[in-house]
Amino acid sequence: MPRERKERDSKDHTKMKEEGGSDLSVRSRKRKPNVPVFLQDPDEEIAKIDKTVKSQDSSQPWDDDSACVDPCSFIPTPNKEEDNELEYPKTAFQPRKIRPPRASPLPVLNWANREEVWRIMLNKEKTYLRDEHFLQRHPLLQARMRAVLLDWLMEVCEVYKLHRETFYLAQDFFDRYMASQQNIIKTLLQLIGISALFIASKLEEIYPPKLHQFAYVTDGACSGDEILTMELMMMKALKWRLSPLTIVSWLNVYVQVAYVNDTGEVLMPQYPQQVFVQIAELLDLCVLDVGCLEFPYGVLAASALYHFSSLELMQKVSGYQWCDIEKCVKWMVPFAMVIREMGSSKLKHFRGVPMEDSHNIQTHTNSLDLLDKAQAKKAILSEQNRISPPPSGVLTPPHSSKKQSSEQETE
């Protein structure tokens, strides 16, 4: 019986293969997935695909040139009119012309690409912005309070023999921090100022003063813990952007380029120290006035250099044109008049500071009195300009020949 059953099963299996049936002798024991299975006739699917391809070919004929079209090329949108050139209405607004970037005045550098260095310097001025109207955010403060604080920071820098760069870093940190806050009271100004100087000294000085020394100069108004707390608050508010190109940094570049030698080596300063100190004293006075925040640091340094040199030299070493600095130069006139009346101070020498670095140490003069004189002159000049406005542009004396001819005509 078993033998006959096996023969019968083999015959049935052979018969099913001949009729085109599937081999069902081996069955899967796995459970079927709980998903529906859609069956479709293969011939029917192929017929649909052919029909779709034919319809696409008939609607979009093949173009030999389309195979060579650049995938990044501009393809106009159908049924859309081309945009005509924008026409500005005749209003008070006039589109400003895009000025080319300032050309690099730097000499050839053997340690870097001068164009790359100059580009980084220009980007610094775009990154580190200040607000000239930051006092509007603090109704309880006045511009005089800022001047008193910065004058005191200059005195602290001279006592601890800190560099000019350290002071101007602290000034930048203070102004940018105040622009990010609101409703600061007067009693916090000294803490903010000394904390800004504490941060700047750790960035710039090789041997910065200790924390207790900064607390000591406040005469008990600020403790070390308060300075550390304010330091963290300031750095968070400044988003840890602590490397601006300060006013004195720009001045250092301009004066160095003006006195660069024929070899083009600029690894060490090669300019007269007295010239640098004279221009720096003008900037020390200008920075006490809150109006200086209206101008970029590079413009302030170039304007100060203009007051002690010439337009040609300023253009050569800074890349600015007269129209770029005209407003700042006129704003700086009363401050320059006060500095000239005072006369240039002698170069100070500090114990333990090398002679070649003495011009970089921040000094302190009776700056608040000079500021009062400058603001008084500014008021007088403003009244004179209101009565008879001066012509715009650079004022130059006439040639000697024209001057003689005019004198003969008057006779």
Curated annotation (Swiss-Prot):
The modification Phosphothreonine is found at T77, T396. GO terms for molecular function: cyclin-dependent protein serine/threonine kinase regulator activity; kinase activity; protein kinase binding; protein-containing complex binding. GO terms for biological process: animal organ regeneration; antral ovarian follicle growth; cell division; cellular response to nutrient; chromosome organization involved in meiotic cell cycle; DNA replication initiation; G1/S transition of mitotic cell cycle; homologous chromosome pairing at meiosis. It is found in: Nucleus. Keywords: Cell cycle, Cell division, Cyclin, Nucleus, Phosphoprotein, Ubl conjugation. Residues 1-44, 381-411 are annotated as: Disordered. SMART domains: CYCLIN, Cyclin_C. InterPro entries: Cyclin, Cyclin-like_dom, Cyclin-like_sf, Cyclin_C-dom, Cyclin_N, Cyclins_cyclin-box. It comes from the Eukaryota. SUPFAM superfamilies: Cyclin-like. Its main location: nucleus. Phosphorylation of both Thr-396 by GSK3 and Ser-400 by CDK2 creates a high affinity degron recognized by FBXW7, and accelerates degradation via the ubiquitin proteasome pathway. Phosphorylation at Thr-77 creates a low affinity degron also recognized by FBXW7. Ubiquitinated by UHRF2; appears to occur independently of phosphorylation. The modification Phosphoserine is found at S104, S388, S400. The keyword Nucleus applies. Residues 1-20 have a biased composition (Basic and acidic residues). One of its GO terms (cellular component) is cyclin E1-CDK2 complex. Belongs to the cyclin family. Cyclin E subfamily. Interacts with CDK2 protein kinase to form a serine/threonine kinase holoenzyme complex. The cyclin subunit imparts substrate specificity to the complex. Found in a complex with CDK2, CABLES1 and CCNA1. Part of a complex consisting of UHRF2, CDK2 and CCNE1. Interacts directly with UHRF2; the interaction ubiquitinates CCNE1 and appears to occur independently of CCNE1 phosphorylation. Interacts with INCA1. Essential for the control of the cell cycle at the G1/S (start) transition. This is G1/S-specific cyclin-E1.
